[in-house]
């Protein structure tokens, strides 16, 4: 009987930080070795960070990554390590290095290269053509990368039919809401269908607009979960795999005897690479695998936003942020996220009232700042607003007050926030949500200014849900109740309400999900029971405001289809359908 201990290290690399990433990887290898692991796996492109985008077009970047791999190989004595890197042949490959006892024994090249959503693998990499399995004593295991395991056939099936008892998949799988459950079910199915133990290791951390959730998983040969890593945290998880159980399961599962696969048609060749002929059992205490708990949807999204904000700010060299508080839900939620991400002392909030700012907004903004313990300033902009109106009065003569005058206030606020940013080196966090940016209910060069739009991909109804979550988890509510219950308003004119300009958010968010995330047609949305005039207004307004969204700060992806990396539409476009 052979029992093999597998460790999965979900690390948080920094893009292009070869020294730092290499040190992280070596620390994980050393820790796994000290806990008696036979194999430790690290995520896809762990050496470079993911996704490197056009850094992959720089030969010197590829060379630096290979140099880092050499250092990792030398540090991997007494263990087998699987590490994601960029391999160079006549082309470049998204690759996994299989290192055994300080020697690079083999390399796997990713076969399925995704070219949808946020993925551009085909832009850079050449697909692999082999599906190697690795012999470790009497244990055979296969290695593949991320997308390779999302298909029922492909490398996983080829490797299993060639004798692999264990499949190790290294991934950089970006987060979106509810993806974790879908991914877990898929992986359990792969393990059960192929009668293999399956280990999946994922990146954790933020990279620009993407967040990686970790959530590494290990399943037994029946598809039962035996270990799960923490979500949105670095972690190192272990499991002991008994390959005799895999053999017994296969004896009792006649499906494998009937399976056939045309390897040539798949473009893959199965080959065996020997790591060691003999396995020497290690003396070690039995290990108990940890199964981290699943989170509620609200907690999951909130933690994704916290991690994405923390990493975006810190990895880009900032320590502090500044936020304009309006007394509304959006800026309140962003302030809570920022305080959790960076610490209250690193978050500066500013309230900038005019004649249209209500007493309730002033009260609630101050209460929120006090509850969070963040530095808080009030900078009145009424006099500046008056000066703008006076300066423009000759040019505006004969016209009525309207959107132009309203937006002057937002742009004054934007200027003040940017001045504070320049003076104190703090990153401005913009506070717009997905519903408003979808239909352009925001001011270009005003409330849109900033270095990161934290809730850019969060629909308005989800904003409210997250605010309730923030208050539920606290001994005392952090967000004043009136901020949540009052009708939303930009407060740029007398008695202004969002619903004066927009459909109710319950309707708007539903139509936006159908149009933006599902690409449903106008006719299909009307057939769902939505008012034709409202549907046509939403579609037209979304399309017309593409130019605004192109100029917005990046934001953290949490839905299945975010603006920017996911949804790529032309600005100049007259098609409505």
What kind of region is each of these model predictions?
Residues 1-324, 340:
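Enzyme catalytic cores with a strong preference for nitrogen-chemistry domains
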Residues 195, 221, 245-326, 331-577:
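ATP/NTP-dependent adenylation/nucleotidyl-transfer catalytic domains that generate, transfer
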